[in-house]
Curated annotation (Swiss-Prot):
Binding-site residues, ATP: G34, P35, S36, G37, A38, G39, K40, T41
Membrane topology: Peripheral membrane protein
Organism: Bacteroides fragilis (strain ATCC 25285 / DSM 2151 / CCUG 4856 / JCM 11019 / LMG 10263 / NCTC 9343 / Onslow / VPI 2553 / EN-2)
UniProt entry keywords in alphabetical sequence: ATP-binding, Cell inner membrane, Cell membrane, Membrane, Nucleotide-binding, Translocase, Transport
Listed name of the protein: Lipoprotein-releasing system ATP-binding protein LolD
Subcellular location per the Swiss-Prot or TrEMBL entry: Cell inner membrane
Length: 216
């Protein structure tokens, strides 16, 4: 599903990633842990084609994306990869349903189909009755679940999450963590999660430890 080979990345004189090799299989829920500055977020961004490595090969869902041009990468990213960040980044002027539909619109999905697909996901997440509410009318946990729904709308093969529960209280953290496994079991996606949350790391299928730009 995800194959990285010899990934390096530097910012100026600082080498952040030092030859990363990594294989993640279809349907795995994988956590990436390590101290601040270990290179976790940079690795996730490169994995998600949001940044490019200085050297190395990236293969996602059977496609070598290493040599793709930006326009190709953008289309590939929108179709094959979903992103969840610590802060939900929902657009305040749109309802929960409309926020979830945005990536589908970008992909050219007809409005009716996008709406049906978005409502199905929101229903699965227990948010059907909140679909017409705007972000300021939702709780923190609800907003983050809407953000997860948005990541799922184009049925991507991979979901990449960077500290997805970092801004939530303990109850909402537990609900969100369980949701990742429920979604994997329902839709078959692969999840790669950068986290400092030890409880989440313990329940993932595999934990990848990073220190100083290396996997140990």
């Amino acid at each position: 599903m995800i194959h990285l080979e010899g990934i390096t990345k530097s910012f100026g004189s600082l080498q952040v990633l030092k030859g990363i090799d990594l294989e993640i299989t279809q349907g795995e829920v994988v956590s990436i842990v390590g101290p601040s500055g270990a290179g976790k977020t940079t690795l996730l961004q490169i994995m998600g084609t949001l940044d490019s490595p200085d050297a190395g090969m990236i293969n996602i869902d059977g496609t070598n994306v290493s040599r793709m041009k930006e326009k190709e990468l953008s289309a590939f990213r929108n179709k094959h990869i979903g992103f969840v960040f610590q802060f939900h980044q929902l657009l305040p002027e749109f309802t929960a349903l409309e926020n979830v539909m945005i990536p589908a619109f970008i992909a050219g999905v007809p409005t009716k189909e996008a709406s049906m697909r978005a409502m199905e996901i929101l229903d699965f997440m227990g948010l059907k009755e909140r679909a017409s509410h705007k972000p300021n009318e939702l709780s923190g946990g609800e907003k983050q679940r809407v953000a997860v729904a948005r990541a799922l709308i184009n049925q991507p093969a991979v979901i990449l999450a960077d500290e997805p529960s970092g801004s939530l209280d303990s109850h909402n953290k537990e609900e969100l963590h369980q949701l990742f496994f429920d979604l994997r079991n329902r839709f078959g996606q692969t999840f790669v999660i950068v986290t400092h949350d030890e409880a989440l790391a313990k329940i993932t299928d595999r934990t990848i430890h990073m220190v100083d730009g290396n996997i140990i």
